[in-house]
Amino acid sequence: MGLLDGRVCVITGGAGSLGLASARRFLDEGAKVMLVDLEGATRARALADLASPNVDAVAADVSQATGARAYIERTVARFGPIDVLFSNAGNQGPVVPVTEYPEDAFDALLAVHVRGAFLACKYGLPRMNDGGSVIITSSVVGAMGAPGSVAYVTAKHAQVGLMRTVAREAARRRIRVNTLHPGPVDNAFQLRIEQGISRLAGVDATRMLDEMIPLARHARPEEIARSALYLASDLSSFVTATTLMVDGGMRG
């Protein structure tokens, strides 16, 4: 019997690197999984890759109430009430100093990371089973600063405040709410960030980050997925309102 046997999980940003790795791990543990992702080709590839009758996918703009309601209701209609709500969707902005940061880019980034997580909780919690789990993907920079990334860092800190508040409110239903904080991950999303840092600072950002991490490397997506599984499952049955750092000791 798997750790998530028969449980219904929804993952926003589900066709991306961390979402897909988590979906694969959840399916291996017996879950039914709904992937939420705007990119049609990416969704199709994810479904083909996972190749399971227990996975489906839906297009939705997580930053809009209509989109959030739609993916929640689609999940419930397809699989039943939700046990694991994994708010994992993310986007990127430019890597520039705060004095040069475009206001529209700032707003767009917070819309996905912060408003998206808020809407997931607002519309997802009423459709969840008691005793479930909410996971919000933050970042190691949700606990530190990072020059050139004012919008991303602000959003990742804001998610922690959201998590702690929702955890207090959801506790009466035994729903646990936590943030997951990956350090640098070996994927295309992180590479684009590092390319921006390299241009801004005139350094090899990938090497610089590896030197900042005591384990001296980037994480693999499947390592982050294992931590998501921990938060999703009963392994973390007495864990709520906390920040799980998966950063190779970067914040140690």
Residue locations for each model-derived region?
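Conserved glycine-rich cofactor-binding loop
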Residues: 8, 15-17
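Substrate-binding pocket helix/loop in short-chain dehydrogenase/reductase
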Residues: 96-98, 102-107, 209
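Active-site helix of classical SDR
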Residues: 121, 155, 163
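C-terminal helical subdomain
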Residues: 179, 187, 203-235, 239, ...
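Residue(s) in the substrate-gating loop at a strand-loop-helix junction
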Residues: 139
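Short, small/polar-rich loop/turn modules that mediate ligand/substrate recognition or access, typified
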Residues: 171, 176, 239-241
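Short C-terminal tail/terminal secondary-structure segment
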Residues: 92-95, 144, 229, 240-252
